[in-house]
Amino acid sequence: MIGGCGSLFLPGTKICAVDSPKFWLAYWRSMADSYAHVTYLEQRFGNGAARLDIRAYRSARGAQREGRDTPEAQFVRESHEKRATENDHAKPLITACRTSLMFFEGNSSLEWTFVSPPAMYRSGRKTGTYETLTDYIPLRGDQNDSGILEGRLKGISTFDFAIAIADEAERRNFREQHWTAWGEISDDEPAPSPYINL
């Protein structure tokens, strides 16, 4: 079963990312700061991306960083971050993914595995390499410290995530476990989304 990153726990806790305003803030800030992620969201959701205001939010964050802030940019940042931490539009879907995991946990009557992508999952180049972790969101730096999440969320390309899933289907290393895989996505160049032609 493939779920969402919100099903993963914050390191050192038993708090799911979906239930953490701190996670949502770090998630949307990381998304907006990446040109590749903004493009990926627009490709994946088409006109629905307009509801996200991701490009306007990206611009407002850039204005603040570059010392050219305006009251309008501040309003965009504050309203977007308030919506992200109080009532993110994606929360119902991610909560549903977490609920589906709960049907599997503790069930030994069938052979199952449940994989969640890391937070910064997007289209990108294929490297063929990845790392794995069970139950927790992968972070840069101290994996056991979830105090500050901003700038620490790891990711993976859609290609490498597919390789990790295929490898698990063959190797079965994560039987009856919830796991994730992450890889190299340091380039910030947009790649064609596999969702465009769906």
Residue ranges and their predicted role:
Residues 1-2:
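Generic beta-sheet signal
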Residues 5-198:
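Oxidoreductase cofactor-interface core, primarily capturing Rossmann-like NAD(P)-dependent enzymes
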